[in-house]
A protein has these predicted regions:
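Extracytoplasmic/secretory soluble proteins
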Residues: 2-3, 10-15, 19, 23-507
Length: 507
């Protein structure tokens, strides 16, 4: 990789004086026939992939003449390793998916992806019109854009889910819960008495101990209690900022919010009272729904119907964390133009189509296949997928996730969502979410690499404390915190603040 990085640095230096996007590469004439290779993560090549991709290229001729695409779908489990080999060997790849398996910052530093800023300005205006102003900041480093986030749901309010039959019996006071969890105050130990009373009632009236989702404990309580009412965003480890705080002051999650430790009092008290089941450490999953009475959930329109289908009972949800924000850290699914692409201008023209309504028929075909064979239309912009399993399964003849190849909110809605889902996510969720105050910031973890590794290892060692099963939890928390401090947790906060300050001055 050192050789590759050296080549990338030399190439960047050679292009420093170039004003042409694509590092001064010759622009492709419109009548030149171009074949682009596009690699992405998914279930791999499916039974009908070659047939669909052939039809896609026929359709593409109407949108981008003299262009064909050679799609290569790599199974998710193999994607990171295969991409690194392709990139190191400078294989003939023009467009590459950048998923959660890869460290985006590291890939950029190694020269894997092209700076797309000027290409987007020249060829990407259709997609830019559809994006929120902050979207391309998610994949920007030092003011340069290295990938296009595959636009989908980028934020979500958090809530709790209980069986409707328990609401009907009056076992939980929803009005009281909605008054408390409204995002206007710091949540305290006393506020969770609402849930304790509910679980105690279940314990008294049902034969089995109440099963509380472990995700509800950690996401529904631990990530709320004693923390800023406006929300907090983790930069790394214990270094956090308050959502919307334009000063970008970095706080220490371990030491600056003592009220957060009330979480451990709550879960240990509940465990001792029998309202947290005794096998929670051995059985933390929440996929078996029959005995569960309290879950963590995403608060989205129509979610209750989805959860009802999943757990085979009617559900009622209510918000426990109404503040939604978009993290600066980037999207988990993006698309980049590779540094070795011979036709970056044509690649960008294609990405503009796949990320805008202008090219929605192309994206829908690449995602869902052929009408009548892989799906049937149920409305102007809605379909019923005809595969054996859910979309993205290797057992289907065709069908890829809509977030893999472009703007997911320009694809058909399926039977898994309601009509108008895309508009709802775009307007009611994404555009109403608060963008991070750190949009455009990139943390260089090199100066604190050892400290981060130490922190993560120690937190993993003491993760069992989250379940409430440890009688001497206070002693163990002190022991954990002493190890964190010795491992450099203070240095993490100091270094992050230093970098944030430097970034703010450079804006």
């Amino acid at each position: 990789m050192k050789f590759k990085k050296t080549i990338a640095i030399l190439a960047a230096a050679a292009c420093a004086g170039s004003v042409m996007a694509g590092c001064g590469k010759k622009e492709t004439s419109a009548d030149e026939k171009v074949k682009l290779t596009w690699v992405f993560g998914g279930p791999g090549t499916l039974e009908d992939s070659d047939m669909v991709w052939g039809e896609y290229n026929k359709l593409l001729e109407d949108y981008l003449p003299n262009t064909t695409v050679n799609f290569k779908c790599i199974p998710h489990a193999d994607y990171a390793e295969k991409w690194r080999l392709m990139s190191a060997a400078q294989e003939d790849v023009d467009i590459a998916w950048v998923g959660w398996q890869l460290n985006f910052i590291d890939e950029v530093s190694m020269g894997s992806y092209l700076d797309m800023t000027e290409l987007i300005n020249k060829y990407g205006q259709d997609m830019k019109k559809e994006f929120p102003d902050w979207l391309l900041d998610l994949t920007s480093i030092n003011g340069k854009i290295y990938a296009i986030p595959n636009y989908q749901m980028m934020a979500s309010p958090i809530g709790a889910l209980v069986p409707k039959e328990h609401i009907d019996k009056g076992w939980i006071d929803l009005d009281a819960a909605n008054k408390v969890f409204n995002g206007e105050k710091v949540i305290t130990k006393e506020d969770y008495k609402i849930f304790e009373d509910y679980l105690t009632t279940v314990l008294k009236n049902e034969k089995n101990p109440p099963r509380v989702s472990k995700q509800f404990l950690t996401r529904g309580i631990k990530w709320n209690i004693g923390l800023p009412a406006e929300g907090r965003e983790i930069i790394t480890c214990n270094a956090v900022v308050k959502v919307g705080d334009k000063s970008c002051k970095v706080y220490d999650l371990i030491n600056d919010f003592p009220g957060n430790y009330d979480y451990y009092d709550i879960v240990n008290d509940w465990y001792n009272k029998g309202i947290i089941r005794k096998d929670i450490l051995e059985n933390p999953e929440e996929t078996e729904g029959d005995d569960y009475v309290l879950w963590w959930c995403q608060m989205l329109k129509g979610a209750e119907n989805s959860y009802a289908s999943r757990y085979s009972r009617e559900m009622v949800s209510f918000t426990t964390d109404p503040e939604i924000f978009v993290s600066y850290k980037g999207s988990s699914t993006n698309t980049a133009i590779t540094s070795q692409s011979k036709h970056p201008d044509r690649a960008m023209q294609l990405l503009n189509l796949m990320n805008s309504k202008k090219g929605a028929p192309l994206l829908n075909m690449a995602t869902y296949g052929i009408e009548g064979k892989h799906y049937k239309k149920t409305g102007e912009n809605s379909i019923e997928f005809l595969g054996k399993e859910t979309i993205g399964s290797a057992n289907n003849k065709y069908g890829y996730e809509n977030w893999a190849l472009g703007n997911a909110l320009d694809t058909y809605t399926t039977q898994y969502n309601f009509d108008g889902w895309n508009e709802y996510i775009d307007k009611e969720i994404n555009r109403k979410a608060m963008p991070s105050c750190l949009m455009g910031f990139t943390l260089d973890t090199a100066p604190i690499k050892m400290e981060i590794a130490q922190y993560q290892a120690i937190m993993k060692e003491y993760e069992y404390l989250d379940a409430g099963t440890t009688p001497n939890y206070k002693e163990k928390l002190k022991e954990r915190n002493a190890k964190l401090k010795a491992g450099g947790s203070d240095k993490i906060v100091e270094e992050v603040q230093r970098q944030v300050n430097k970034w703010m001055k450079s804006k």
